[in-house]
């Protein structure tokens, strides 16, 4: 089974459990509203209510936070944009139909931000650290995320992780999905460049640089799975195997869902 198929199955699995638990919560609340004299175990009812409150409070917090931070950082990046370089870069990659913003900052910054209209943000430090070919490899990696709407997909995955983090299947699924997405973005950049040399130089230099400052509400070039990404560079002819380790979390999550179904109908 290819990594792309595995990634899609894992994502579908996350969404399935999220929707299933939400449906059970809805049924339970409907049952509660129709019958105030529930015959079930009182402590289970209280616990179920607490789980519902916790879940939806976390989801709402994430939605508000994402909306606020996304707007905040877009305004911040626009206010610090290097007008001339931004204009040149947008003209150079005009066929991408994607807005690029070059921020005046000596530090390394390369990310994709925005869900409805994703944008690529890079710092002037990127142009100081890397040559033209290496910069293009970085931009191609970010463009992959833009053209595949990965910000929306990762936001949904993060929403599931925040709201349904108590399901054992969610956290490893999000981690696996994010890792494969980064590998696919790297592979796309390599294919477009025709060589792994330029992207490899970027990754190795970033490893030497150490920790990179990150921003919320964005997909970052350096954020995930650097060891797997370097392995893909070193062995481009081989498919990088990312362990899933989802069998036990899947069984535990199924047990939790079954418990909710039994308790909700009692």
Feature locations, PLM:
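Hydrophobic or amphipathic, alpha-helical segments that drive membrane association/targeting
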Residues: 1-102, 240-243, 258-266
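Active-site recognition of the HExxH zinc-binding catalytic motif
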Residues: 122, 133-154, 158, 185-186
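Active-site scaffold of zinc-dependent metalloenzymes
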Residues: 106-132
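Post-HEXXH active-site segment of zinc metalloproteases
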Residues: 150-174, 178
């Amino acid at each position: 089974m290819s990594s792309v198929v595995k990634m899609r199955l894992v994502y579908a699995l996350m969404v399935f459990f999220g929707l299933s638990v939400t449906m059970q919560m809805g049924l339970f609340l409907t049952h509660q509203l129709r019958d105030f004299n529930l015959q079930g175990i009182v402590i289970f009812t209280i616990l179920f209510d607490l789980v519902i409150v916790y879940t939806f409070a976390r989801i709402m917090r994430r939605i508000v936070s994402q909306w606020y931070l996304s707007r905040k950082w877009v305004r911040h990046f626009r206010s610090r944009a290097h007008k001339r370089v931004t204009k040149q870069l947008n003209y150079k990659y005009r066929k991408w139909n994607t807005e690029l913003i070059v921020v005046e900052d000596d530090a390394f910054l390369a990310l994709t931000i925005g869900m409805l209209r994703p944008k690529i943000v890079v710092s002037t430090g990127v142009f100081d650290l890397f040559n033209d070919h290496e910069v293009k490899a970085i931009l191609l990696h970010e463009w992959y995320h833009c053209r595949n709407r990965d910000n929306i997909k990762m936001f949904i995955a993060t929403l599931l992780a925040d709201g349904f983090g108590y399901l054992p299947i969610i956290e490893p699924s999000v981690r696996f999905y994010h890792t494969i997405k980064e590998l696919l973005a790297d592979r796309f950049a390599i294919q477009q460049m025709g060589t792994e040399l330029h992207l490899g130089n970027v990754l190795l230099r970033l490893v030497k640089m150490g920790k990179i400052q990150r921003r919320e509400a964005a997909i970052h070039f350096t954020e995930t799975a650097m060891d797997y990404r370097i392995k893909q560079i070193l062995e481009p002819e081989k498919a990088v195997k990312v362990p899933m380790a989802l069998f036990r979390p899947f069984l535990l999550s199924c047990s939790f869902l079954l418990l909710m179904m039994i308790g909700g109908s009692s």
